[in-house]
Amino acid sequence: MDNIMQSSMPPGFRFHPTEEELVGYYLDRKINSMKSALDVIVEIDLYKMEPWDIQARCKLGYEEQNEWYFFSHKDRKYPTGTRTNRATAAGFWKATGRDKAVLSKNSVIGMRKTLVYYKGRAPNGRKSDWIMHEYRLQNSELAPVQEEGWVVCRAFRKPIPNQRPLGYEPWQNQLYHVESSNNYSSSVTMNTSHHIGASSSSHNLNQMLMSNNHYNPNNTSSSMHQYGNIELPQLDSPSLSPSLGTNKDQNESFEQEEEKSFNCVDWRTLDTLLETQVIHPHNPNILMFETQSYNPAPSFPSMHQSYNEVEANIHHSLGCFPDS
């Protein structure tokens, strides 16, 4: 019959009835000796068979199964008693929890009892992972339990708790997080080093310019000229937030400061240059070198013009005194 059952099932056939279908259709027809459209639930003597033998006995079709259905007839443990015989050769089935009602259109049509298989003899049996749901016909939850008659059962093995998906490795997942954090730290360190290096380069450049142009009243014009022609490199700063501004704003502010520096003239510097000219009238090369290196704004007279005017005044003053 097993070969006929397996060969009659089409490929891909799966049997997953609901509790209402098990009780209201299959069990009801079994008790009333009515044939079903397809005999997919077999009859077995559950208490003469171990749970691991149910898989081969109740196999349906060619697909792998994780639950098995069968009819079983309950017998009394003692002829004059009311308890059901649930012992097997290697162990026993023990009821656990409360019975649950099976409903159809909000009406009770049956009850479900949950049993767990124990290896050995009571009360020292070892609990296994085999579980069975036993369904019986019953019209009310308060009706007395019938210890004899047909029941339909669904046997399965309890799933392993905290079962990981296939191929899941916790250490790989942890390593991934560690590597990600290390990569992030390395990138932050490299960016920080880059900005620090840029700031150091700019600072060294400023120090070099300051060392070549020590403060000197005679060298003020050349230092102003050099700082006006040299364009300092722009420092890169990490963009922390949009509120800190953009490079465009920085360039505009730099140009404004540069324009202010050219438009502003320190009159003390001009006085110093004039005093230097008067003190050294016979050494015009120094004055000519200093004044030529200075390039003021077009709105003010050039230093070369000032030198010519001063020289003319000196000659005019000397001409007023006759030679002795």
Swiss-Prot record:
Its main location: nucleus. The keyword Transcription regulation applies. Residues 232-244 have a biased composition (Low complexity). One of its GO terms (biological process) is xylem vessel member cell differentiation. It holds the Pfam family NAM. Residues 109-164 bind DNA. Coiled coil: none annotated. Disruption phenotype: Defects in protoxylem vessel formation in seedling roots. Residues 9-158 form the NAC domain. It is found in: Nucleus. Induction: By brassinosteroids (e.g. brassinolide BL), auxin (e.g. 2,4-dichlorphenoxyacetic acid 2,4-D) and cytokinin (e.g. kinetin), with a synergistic effect. Up-regulated in a feed-back loop by ASL20. Levels are monitored by proteasome-mediated degradation. Repressed by WEE1 upon replication stress to prevent premature tracheary element differentiation. Accumulates during infection by the soilborne fungal pathogen Verticillium longisporum, especially in tissues undergoing de novo xylem formation. Residues 232-259 are annotated as: Disordered. It comes from the Eukaryota. Keywords: Activator, Cell wall biogenesis/degradation, Developmental protein, DNA-binding, Nucleus, Plant defense, Transcription, Transcription regulation. GO terms for molecular function: DNA-binding transcription factor activity; identical protein binding; protein heterodimerization activity; protein homodimerization activity; sequence-specific DNA binding; transcription cis-regulatory region binding. Expressed in developing protoxylems in roots and shoots. Detected in root protoxylem poles and in vessels of protoxylems, outermost metaxylems, inner metaxylems, shoots and hypocotyls. Expressed in roots, hypocotyls, cotyledons and leaves. Accumulates in the xylem but not in interfascicular fibers or pith cells in inflorescence stems. Present in developing vessels of the secondary xylem in roots undergoing secondary growth. The keyword Nucleus applies. One of its GO terms (cellular component) is nucleus. Transcription activator that binds to the secondary wall NAC binding element (SNBE), 5'-(T/A)NN(C/T)(T/C/G)TNNNNNNNA(A/C)GN(A/C/T)(A/T)-3', in the promoter of target genes (e.g. genes involved in secondary wall biosynthesis, cell wall modification such as xylan accumulation, and programmed cell death). Involved in xylem formation in roots and shoots, especially regulating protoxylem vessel differentiation by promoting immature xylem vessel-specific genes expression. Required for the soilborne fungal pathogen Verticillium longisporum-induced transdifferentiation of chloroplast-containing bundle sheath cells to functional xylem elements leading to stunted growth, vein clearing, and leaf chloroses, as well as xylem hyperplasia within the vasculature of leaves, hypocotyls, and roots due to reinitiation of cambial activity and transdifferentiation of xylem parenchyma cells. This developmental reprogramming also mediates an increased drought stress tolerance. The NAC domain includes a DNA binding domain and a dimerization domain. Forms homodimer and heterodimers with other VND proteins (e.g. NAC037/VND1, NAC076/VND2 and NAC105/VND3) via their N-termini. Interacts with NAC083/VNI2. This is NAC domain-containing protein 30. It comes from Arabidopsis thaliana (Mouse-ear cress).
